[in-house]
Amino acid sequence: MYSALVRACAVIAFLILSPNCARALQDHAKDNGDIFIINYDSFDGDVDDISTTTSAPREADYVDFDEVNRNCNASFITSMTNVLQFNNTGDLPDDKDKVTSMCYFHCFFEKSGLMTDYKLNTDLVRKYVWPATGDSVEACEAEGKDETNACMRGYAIVKCVFTRALTDARNKPTV
């Protein structure tokens, strides 16, 4: 009789605790071997709550421009003001940091693969900068050819690319 009472209490305790334990387990991410799955009832939208063990596939010619920017800016510290002015006008301000900014843009084009040994990667330039037409690529590669300073020569090519891109953009407005 005593053992039947203990067994009945154990069954009642189990029935009471089971739903609470199951609910607690559902609130934790589960590992299906590849991706952590979250119970969306408890997901608050915070990116930190999501993690994965596999990276997303990338295109063969993918360029991580943020990483390139960090690497080049570590060596050639360039203000965002100079970068934005160059991106909008094709010119750098005449200040004490102009040569450093020239080296930054040369570095950026080299490290991103847009240019290698003063030769433009036509596919990447067309994909990321502007759809170069005619002899634009060859004309830009010829810029600064007599320049002995690597930064100056690279910058001359980059400036040509941006100037032509900006000119094309102004002449062909988008709808």
Curated annotation (Swiss-Prot):
Q: Report the leader peptide range.
A: 1-24
Q: Where in the cell is it found?
A: Secreted
**What cellular-component terms does GO give this entry?**
extracellular region
Keywords, in A-Z order: Disulfide bond, Secreted, Signal
Tissue distribution: Present only in a small number of hairs scattered over the surface of the funiculus.
GO BP terms in the entry: sensory perception of chemical stimulus
Which cysteines in this chain are paired by disulphide bridges? 103-151, 140-160
Give an example GO molecular function.
pheromone binding
Record bears the keyword Signal: yes
One Pfam family from the UniProt entry?
PBP_GOBP
InterPro entries, per this entry?
PBP/GOBP, PBP_GOBP_sf
Top-level division of the source organism's lineage = Eukaryota
Q: What is this protein called?
A: General odorant-binding protein 84a
Q: Gene for this protein?
A: Obp84a
